[in-house]
UniProtKB/Swiss-Prot annotation:
One of its GO terms (biological process) is actin cytoskeleton organization. InterPro entries: SopE, SopE-like_GEF_dom_sf, SopE_GEF_dom, SopE_N_dom. Activator for CDC42 by directly engaging this Rho GTPase and acting as potent guanine nucleotide exchange factor (GEF). This activation results in actin cytoskeleton rearrangements and stimulates membrane ruffling, promoting bacterial entry into non-phagocytic cells. Chaperone InvB is required for secretion, translocation and stabilization of intracellular levels of sopE2. This is Guanine nucleotide exchange factor sopE2. Keywords: GTPase activation, Guanine-nucleotide releasing factor, Secreted, Virulence. It is found in: Secreted. GO terms for molecular function: GTPase activator activity; guanyl-nucleotide exchange factor activity. It comes from Salmonella paratyphi A (strain ATCC 9150 / SARB42).
Length: 240
């Protein structure tokens, strides 16, 4: 993986006769910069990735979606499949497997980001269920924190509870949704469509990233999610 020197190059302008930069920033470049930044600030990975990806999209994605004609004609050619194909194309352009095969650190950071997202999503869901049952969430948080620590996630312990440093939104799903919503904004007005596209993005990201876990010691996202669900079910059953 290339050394991260893009920021220095973009701002090092000392002469008035500097020619315009010809190199075009790609989705792969943006992703590589964001995932490498995890080494210094893993907790901000998903946010920074989404911001940079969206910034790139604003300057790179064509704003024209349909040729001029009747409104019904434009809508007829835009389907859910069109949006999903676009997200798949964006995911492929990131070349996650290719980058991971060249850089072990990149591969591990990718796995850490995925497991941290699984931790965050399932923690929030399970905590809501426990609270609705009148069950204290502190023992649950402590136990899933231990599970996250045993899985090899970096983080810190506060008040006896371990929390992964990168807990938050999935750093791979967010850019795909952002890209598609910018290119096809009208397809994201309906809530059911939003849910459908998010589920599809999660599905293709999971399929793309899961093979990376087979080469390491960390549990797969599916295994880690099952661990958290089993812990939650134990507390829910005790509350019944």
């Amino acid at each position: 993986m290339a050394n991260i020197t893009l920021s220095t190059q973009h701002y090092r302008i000392h002469r008035s006769d500097v020619e315009p930069v010809k190199e075009k920033t790609t989705d792969k470049d943006v992703f590589a910069k964001s995932i490498t930044a995890v080494r210094n600030s893993f907790i901000s990975l998903s946010t920074s990735l989404s911001d940079r990806f969206s910034l790139h999209l604003q300057t790179d994605i064509p704003t024209t979606h349909f040729h001029r004609g009747s409104a019904s004609e434009g809508r007829a050619v835009l389907t859910s499949k069109t949006v999903k194909d676009f997200m798949l194309q964006k995911l492929n352009s990131l070349d996650i497997k290719g980058n991971a095969s060249k850089d072990p650190a990149y591969a591990r950071q990718t796995c850490e980001a995925m497991l941290s997202a699984v931790y965050s999503n399932n923690k929030d869901h399970c905590c809501k269920l426990l609270i609705s049952k009148g069950v204290s969430i502190t023992p649950f948080l402590k136990e899933i924190g231990e599970a996250a620590q045993n899985a090899g996630l970096p983080g810190e312990i506060k008040n006896g509870v371990f929390t992964p440093g990168g807990a938050g939104a999935n750093p791979f799903v967010v850019p795909l949704i952002a890209a598609a919503s910018i290119k096809y904004p009208h397809m994201f007005i309906n809530h059911n469509q939003q849910v459908s596209f998010k589920a599809y993005a999660e599905k293709i990201v999971m399929k793309e990233v899961t093979p990376l876990f087979n080469k390491g010691t960390m549990p797969t996202p599916q295994q880690f999610q099952l661990t958290i669900e089993n812990i939650a079910n134990k507390y829910l059953q005790n509350a019944s």
